[in-house]
């Protein structure tokens, strides 16, 4: 008996996409939200505050490099100093893209209390005050910067604000690395109860100023945990 074979399999018509049934612009595992929590003006104001803070920190660290007697601290401050200069440039480049707002007008402290806080951070100039210098930067200022940058990152639009998100992530990488360096330097310098008390007194004084300022971007820097309307 001879088997019979078809020369070609019978073709079936492929179903076509139904234009009357549109698909979502984003996949089910990536359903982004367009608006974000910041208006263009609010984002620009925050970025201007970031730039001002980074510039002031660059100046403070640069001034200390020449006077701190501890060589290991001197080298680390020099490295960190130029990171903050780069961050200031990074934020400056974001400002002109925001509705042609004037970058110089936006480059300012959030309020007078933030300006007073930064003056206090930079105030210790005597060579024997290295502990006070390190506490101000690595136990107060940088943790507050990390909080502000993280809040901004978590609350802005991944669609319309992707360049700012990229800048925030790069800055945060540096901030975490520098915070770790600074904290380890500080721990290595505290050898007595008196050193611990110096560090504690310095941190308390600066944290009090920051509370009065409301954060590096003023009140609302990291949102309001007591605002029940945002639940």
Please report, for each region that a protein language model flagged, where it lies by residue.
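Amphipathic alpha-helical assembly/interaction segments
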Residues: 33, 92, 132-136, 143, ...
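Conserved alpha-helical segments that form or flank metal/cofactor-binding pockets of metalloenzymes
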Residues: 75-118
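Extended, helix-rich structural scaffolds rather than catalytic motifs
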Residues: 194-231
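Amphipathic, well-ordered alpha-helical segments in soluble domains
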Residues: 25, 53-61, 87, 91, ...
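Helix-loop segments that flank and shape redox-cofactor active sites
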Residues: 56-79, 147-164
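An amphipathic alpha-helical core segment
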Residues: 164-204
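Acidic/His metal-coordination segments adjacent to aromatic residues that form catalytic metal sites
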Residues: 28-48, 106-141, 209, 213
């Amino acid at each position: 008996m001879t088997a019979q074979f078809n020369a070609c399999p019978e073709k079936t018509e492929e179903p076509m996409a139904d234009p009357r049934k549109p698909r979502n612009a984003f996949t089910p595992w990536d359903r982004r939200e367009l608006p974000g929590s910041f208006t263009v003006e609010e984002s620009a104001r925050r970025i201007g505050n970031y730039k001002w803070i980074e510039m002031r920190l660059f100046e403070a660290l640069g001034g200390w490099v020449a006077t701190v007697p501890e060589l290991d601290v001197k080298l680390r401050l020099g490295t960190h100093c130029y990171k903050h200069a780069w961050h200031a440039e990074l934020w400056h480049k974001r400002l002109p893209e925001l509705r042609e707002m004037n970058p110089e007008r936006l480059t300012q402290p959030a309020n007078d209390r933030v300006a007073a806080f930064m003056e206090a951070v930079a105030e210790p100039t005597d060579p024997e005050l290295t502990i006070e210098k390190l506490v101000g930067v690595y136990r107060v200022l940088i943790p507050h910067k990390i909080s502000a940058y993280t809040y901004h990152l978590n609350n802005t639009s991944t669609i319309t604000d992707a360049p700012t998100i990229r800048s925030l992530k790069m800055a945060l990488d540096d901030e975490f690395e520098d915070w770790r360096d600074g904290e380890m330097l500080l721990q290595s310098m505290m050898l007595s109860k008196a050193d611990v008390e110096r560090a504690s007194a310095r941190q308390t004084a600066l944290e009090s100023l920051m509370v009065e300022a409301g954060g590096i971007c003023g009140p609302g820097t990291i949102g309001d945990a007591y605002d029940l309307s945002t639940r």
